[in-house]
């Protein structure tokens, strides 16, 4: 069971307690800090849509510390990020692996960040296949389709050729923060919040 901290704020009409994620949402900050599952994706999407309705032009910040997760869940978040009309700042803290790396790269170009000791990783999709021989054939074909689809998305986000993405993703392909800049996964390494404020102050 995950413990969620609560914070207490003085509202002028008394004190009000709220969970830390709700408090961060007030500052247009969304946290992806676990495996990317369907329930998590629905929560993140709801937060993003709420922030869009609050102010369709003001930047949103997404902090990512995730080992990856389900492809469909990750793509749902990715499509929502692209659906928003505002700039999205992404930050890797700790790790952004697999679908986490894709979401990191999906931020607005020029506003994709990593902290100095972050690690990023891309690889090809995988999954257990069970059922009849016909079922196995269909599922294997779907995995190959998703592999090409994800490679196309990463190519668009990073500027790397699709062929290179596919080749690099054959095995777990790890990158440090500076390597991720060279790869096109992020745009800059930040060491303090002051540096991140420069990205959002003009919007």
From Swiss-Prot:
* Keyword DNA-binding in annotation: no
* Gene Ontology molecular function: ATP-dependent peptidase activity; ATPase binding; serine-type endopeptidase activity
Locate the active site.
98, 123
What EC number(s) does this enzyme carry?
Answer: 3.4.21.92
- Catalytic function, reaction form: Hydrolysis of proteins to small peptides in the presence of ATP and magnesium. alpha-casein is the usual test substrate. In the absence of ATP, only oligopeptides shorter than five residues are hydrolyzed (such as succinyl-Leu-Tyr-|-NHMec, and Leu-Tyr-Leu-|-Tyr-Trp, in which cleavage of the -Tyr-|-Leu- and -Tyr-|-Trp bonds also occurs)
Q: Which Pfam families match?
A: CLP_protease (PF00574)
- EC top class named in words: hydrolase
- Gene Ontology BP term (one): protein quality control for misfolded or incompletely synthesized proteins
Q: Any idea where this protein resides?
A: Cytoplasm
Gene Ontology annotations for the cellular component aspect, listed alphabetically: cytoplasm; endopeptidase Clp complex
Keywords for this entry? Cytoplasm, Hydrolase, Protease, Serine protease
As for family, the record states: Belongs to the peptidase S14 family.
What this protein is reported to do is described as: Cleaves peptides in various proteins in a process that requires ATP hydrolysis. Has a chymotrypsin-like activity. Plays a major role in the degradation of misfolded proteins.
How does this polypeptide assemble, per the annotation?
Answer: Fourteen ClpP subunits assemble into 2 heptameric rings which stack back to back to give a disk-like structure with a central cavity, resembling the structure of eukaryotic proteasomes.
Protein name (database record): ATP-dependent Clp protease proteolytic subunit 2
Q: Which organism is it from?
A: Chlamydia pneumoniae (Chlamydophila pneumoniae)
Q: What is the lineage of its organism?
A: Bacteria, Pseudomonadati, Chlamydiota, Chlamydiia, Chlamydiales
Q: Which gene encodes it?
A: clpP2
